[in-house]
């Protein structure tokens, strides 16, 4: 396997330089990466993947050199090789994805200080646009929710909507 690498378990592979793979059918191919669990793959430089059947980090963004857009830490929660998924993902640039509900018992504080922002442009009167947004009651992942639909926000405030790697929309 890789130089100065360690593989422990059933059919594990540590092919990246100074990488570690543990568990069953896990692969650490990125340099300095770690894959632990069942069918986990850590293919990016310095990445750590735990759990089973992860989808992020399973194809290299950058295997032998550091990239801020690559996954730093992933918890895989897939069912099998045809149904790979991630419960949690943190990129080296700090972007974080939680794939289900996030429960916080303390405060969530989001910085909005004008001193942190640049190129500030007024949107003008936004009240007429806000009145076009219709709140909804809906079911999501088996739970009753209240909120808005990203597609409706996108029609009125397209700059507030982004798309993830799976083409799912999110509201900022």
Task: Report the location of each language-model feature.
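Periodic small-residue-enriched repeat registers in elongated scaffold domains
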Residues: 1-99
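C-terminal intramolecular chaperone/autoprocessing and neck/assembly modules of extracellular spikes
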Residues: 94-172
């Amino acid at each position: 396997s890789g130089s100065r690498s360690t593989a422990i378990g059933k059919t594990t592979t540590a092919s990246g330089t100074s990488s570690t793979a543990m568990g069953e059918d896990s692969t650490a191919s990125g340099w300095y990466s770690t894959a632990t669990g069942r069918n986990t793959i850590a293919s990016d430089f310095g990445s750590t993947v735990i759990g089973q059947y992860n989808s992020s980090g399973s194809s290299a963004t950058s295997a032998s050199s550091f990239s801020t857009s690559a996954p730093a830490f992933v918890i895989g929660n897939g069912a099998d090789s045809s149904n790979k998924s991630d419960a949690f993902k943190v990129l080296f640039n700090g972007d974080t994805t939680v794939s289900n509900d996030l429960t916080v018992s303390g405060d969530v504080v989001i910085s909005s200080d004008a001193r942190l922002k640049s190129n500030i442009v007024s949107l003008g009167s936004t009240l007429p646009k806000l009145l076009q947004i219709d709140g909804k009651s809906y079911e999501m992942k088996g739970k009753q929710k209240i909120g808005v639909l990203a597609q409706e926000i996108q029609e009125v405030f397209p700059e507030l909507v982004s798309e993830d790697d799976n083409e799912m929309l999110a509201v900022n």
